[in-house]
């Protein structure tokens, strides 16, 4: 696998109760014993960027990935979820970390216009598979950008086999690395990014958020740069998830509460604003 050293300029592995920005992170031996490791990296070229990386070892019997979907506002109606603060979705004692997942869209009004000024409680249509605890919320034909958990506890990037009942599933936009190779080309689409990657057998996963649209702090990546980062981390396969103002990562802090790790690009009156989401991928402590 080619190593793209121009991307990984500086790496900081955060240790017990150190800080990244103003957030105190409990990346202690306790979390490492659960198979979790958080990294914060600063990238200088081709433009300044800050990335947040959580690696989870799914062979560890004490953790599991879970999809958490927001409330369905209309039952059998067209809406599949209502937008909800992701920290509210993650408000469970078992949650250790989370990131955003699927893209979505609002519904058109009588004039055919869609309200994309996202707000909490807004009914939306989730794009792609959304399955939580075996319950299907968004049921579309699995495709290459689908991500699902198989019966052996491995995270698989790609369409699901017909003979396996899937308990957890989500969807991104497209694969960006496949079998260790970058499969996207450089372009000028520079945005905040969220990506999910796995090793060859799906037992190690990387959850990655790259901040963007913040000049001089973190400006964003194109898909080729994101794929290069995922390849450098060791991903065999990686998928580009919803990004932009949706890109968010939360992780348990030293006080046991979930903390915001990154700097989302949405703003309200100049202040950082967390975009409401229809669903998240969480890493949870397994409860026997």
Question: Which residue stretches match the model-derived regions?
Answer:
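Hydrophobic core
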Residues: 12-19
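Short, solvent-exposed aromatic-acidic interface loops
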Residues: 68-75, 161-165, 209-215
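Bacterial N-terminal signal peptides that target proteins for export
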Residues: 1-8
């Amino acid at each position: 696998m080619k190593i793209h050293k121009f991307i990984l300029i500086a790496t900081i592995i955060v240790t017990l109760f150190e800080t990244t920005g103003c957030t105190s992170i409990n990346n202690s031996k306790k979390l490492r014993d659960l198979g979790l490791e958080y990294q914060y990296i600063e990238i200088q070229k081709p433009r300044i960027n800050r990335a947040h990386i959580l690696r989870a070892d799914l062979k560890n019997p004490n953790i599991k990935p879970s999809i958490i979907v927001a409330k369905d506002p209309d039952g059998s109606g067209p809406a599949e979820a209502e937008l909800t603060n992701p920290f509210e979705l993650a408000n469970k004692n078992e949650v250790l970390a989370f990131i955003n997942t699927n893209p979505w869209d609002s519904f058109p009004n009588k004039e055919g216009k869609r309200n994309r000024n996202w707000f909490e409680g807004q009914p939306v249509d989730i794009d792609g598979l959304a399955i939580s605890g075996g319950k299907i919320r968004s049921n579309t034909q699995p495709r290459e950008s689908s991500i699902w958990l198989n019966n052996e506890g491995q995270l698989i990037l790609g369409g699901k086999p017909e003979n396996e009942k899937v308990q957890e599933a989500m969807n991104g936009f497209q694969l960006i690395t496949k079998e260790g190779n970058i499969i996207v080309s450089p372009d000028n689409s520079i945005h905040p990014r969220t990506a999910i990657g796995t090793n060859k057998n799906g037992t190690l996963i990387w959850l990655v958020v790259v901040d963007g649209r913040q000049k001089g702090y973190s400006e964003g990546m194109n898909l080729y740069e994101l794929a290069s980062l995922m390849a450098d981390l060791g991903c065999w396969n990686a998928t580009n998830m919803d990004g932009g103002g949706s890109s968010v990562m939360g992780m348990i802090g030293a006080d046991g509460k979930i903390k915001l790790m990154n700097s989302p690009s949405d703003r309200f009156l100049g202040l950082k604003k967390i975009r409401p989401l229809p669903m998240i991928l969480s890493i949870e402590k397994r409860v026997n």
